[in-house]
Amino acid sequence: MKCKPNQTRTYDPEGFKKRAACLCFRSEREDEVLLVSSSRYPDRWIVPGGGMEPEEEPDGAAVREVYEEAGVKGKLGRLLGVFEQNQDRKHRTYVFVLTVTELLEDWEDSVSIGRKREWFKIEDAIKVLQCHKPVHAEYLEKLKLGGSPTNGNSAAPSPPESEP
């Protein structure tokens, strides 16, 4: 564990920072996704998520992060996958699907850092994410391919093809 001013970073045994995020959808049709402005670059959009706290489960961390960053509550759905980022930082992010049921007018990050949120059609969200956060665009690409816990996990190798 390492400490940031307001947070304890947690790592898995392989040295990956443990993170959780949600693709927050306006409805169960999953055709509009909520993105939030980056805290570092307010003109860039990202998928809400962040580091897991000690003893926190991925699903609880995902719900907490979207509440803090996007000011939403909702119905937590499936685990879309576990995504690894190795280039600049070693992150392992559990990404869940959440259907939004409540939008808070003011929320923690809107008040403290002026964070914004906006609904995007899936294709538009992929375009805005690909420039600055390509791994976030991957979440939506997997969703478009019918991502669900039954068809694989981005961090796990694919099973070998069986011979006919």
Curated annotation (Swiss-Prot):
A Pfam family reported for this protein in Swiss-Prot or TrEMBL: NUDIX
Matching SUPFAM superfamilies: Nudix
EC number: 3.6.1.52, 3.6.1.60
Binding sites annotated in the UniProt record for substrate: R9, K17, K18, R19, S38, S39, R40, R89, K90, H91, R115, K133
Cofactors named for this entry: Mg(2+); Mn(2+)
A GO term, aspect molecular function: diphosphoinositol-polyphosphate diphosphatase activity
Record's catalysed reaction(s): diphospho-myo-inositol polyphosphate + H2O = myo-inositol polyphosphate + phosphate; P(1),P(6)-bis(5'-adenosyl) hexaphosphate + H2O = adenosine 5'-pentaphosphate + AMP + 2 H(+); P(1),P(5)-bis(5'-adenosyl) pentaphosphate + H2O = adenosine 5'-tetraphosphate + AMP + 2 H(+)
Protein name: Diphosphoinositol polyphosphate phosphohydrolase 3-beta
